[in-house]
From Swiss-Prot:
It comes from the Eukaryota. This is Zinc finger protein 726. InterPro entries: KRAB (IPR001909), KRAB_dom_sf (IPR036051), Krueppel_C2H2_ZnFinger (IPR050826), Znf_C2H2_sf (IPR036236), Znf_C2H2_type (IPR013087). Belongs to the krueppel C2H2-type zinc-finger protein family. The gene is ZNF726.
Amino acid sequence: MGLLTFRDVAIEFSLEEWQCLDTAQKNLYRNVMLENYRNLAFLGIAVSKPDLIICLEKEKEPWNMKRDEMVDEPPGICPHFAQDIWPEQGVEDSFQKVILRRFEKCGHENLQLRKGCKSVDECKVHKEGYNGLNQCFTTTQGKASQCGKYLKVFYKFINLNRYKIRHTRKKPFKCKNCVKSFCMFSHKTQHKSIYTTEKSYKCKECGKTFNWSSTLTNHKKTHTEEKPYKCEEYGKAFNQSSNYTTHKVTHTGEKPYKCEECGKAFSQSSTLTIHKRIHTGEKPCKCEECGKAFSQPSALTIHKRMHIGEKPYKCEECGKAFVWSSTLTRHKRLHSGEKPYKCEECAKAFSQFGHLTTHRIIHTGEKPYKCEECGKAFIWPSTLTKHKRIHTGEKPYKCEECGKAFHRSSNLTKHKIIHTGEKPYKCEECGKAFIWSSNLTEHKKIHTREKPYKCEECSKAFSRSSALTTHKRMHTGEKPYKCEECGKAFSQSSTLTAHKIIHTGEKPYKCEECGKAFILSSTLSKHKRIHTGEKPYKCEECGKTFNQSSNLSTHKIIHTGEKPYKCEECGKAFNRSSNLSTHKIIHTGEKPYKCDECGKSFIWSSTLFKHKRIHT
């Protein structure tokens, strides 16, 4: 009995036979032959490269290759075992119809020794090694392979070596065009076609094209909302089996992929790979439109939709459209009121898993992402990224209408409504309308007088958490917002914005009634009330109304008699901070208001105004 060579496993075609094959069949033939040769080379059987392989690698027509032109390979495989892992050859048989024989277990007495083997056991060792070559041929019956605690049944390909490689997590085959790597050479070959293959599979629904028919099939499910893969545990359904497999890990809680840098563990190796980029700062996914780079291909896909304005997922309830199907799913919960994510600690429920994750940190108090510039810590890396822009002054989000730039995309979205004038959220109590639902929620607290945010230092309460945060800086003296022009620091970003206009002199908000211009849009809104006579802030004690909430707050002190602003020099107290500031001048002797006519100085601006009448 002879030994198996590459000649024995190669399939040949005449010119007539080759011309009967279509492009897909020719490509399949080429892939099978190259894969067979690589398997022999891997075991050290194929030493020199046959002419057929050279021809196929150069993508030339192999029909004119004759069997005697193929270089005979050194002996390597025992034909007894080869019958079980390689198909019978013959030009008359189509390579597509070749079926791998079922492997029959045989006892020691039935084993034929490989030429050169000294014992049955040695021959058996060779046999075990060749089981890994069973690839690229369809089998008539699946075989099972136990790996750790997993039992996998292979119906399409019998390849134990491939299975083992997946579990060692080694990815030796790297793509030259990008940073992606693969555990199998065939996977790399398939991936490379992204760069070379024409996207011939087109979606009739939206016109999107794909490299693979299978990808098109998966994509079509986004339009039909078909989700055939259902979780038995919670009933959640998925449109792809891979997403279903990923979801199942959430029930087991297993996270075998650990980051060596920070110790964080993940359920998927791909998630670990993406996570590592936080430490390395690597952003391999670049937008060809604007040059912006991302650490994840999914983030790049989302970003690209900003350029084309694509929003394929539409809500049937209200007509609102979204970039992602997952965003649509979350949005639908606003209409249904569904809150599937429940906190085990306090039983609070949420409509989004991300909100539950954020909420959980309230119980742990963990803030792992720290700013190197000022030491401030954050729950999320994205929040840290946004915070850093305060220090760098970066404003990547620009309004196409007026050119104004912003630190955050959400701020740009808010700003755009200024141009449209749309205010869809209306207060049922007073009729006031707002751009955002959050602003309406905050406004309603004026009517209910609810102030849930209390200062631990002085017990003062606020209706907004942001107002409490700003207030706390009075006690700490923190002023994180610094002017690059003059170095002056402020406790609020809005105050810094207003201050910067002193240097530029810009007053972009103009009153259409009288032409007066203002630095801030909020100041313009307050000014307009002079013309309209609107006074929305009413004192419950005496019924007096005011056009500004600050004036109402000052007025209320008349009824309470409270004087919170005390002079450290003489102990005199005042109901306004401005009155205290004016009073302090008595102790310092400062007279900042000077007459240009005679040089006389005054403590008060009103006194200077009266004095000027002497000259006129």
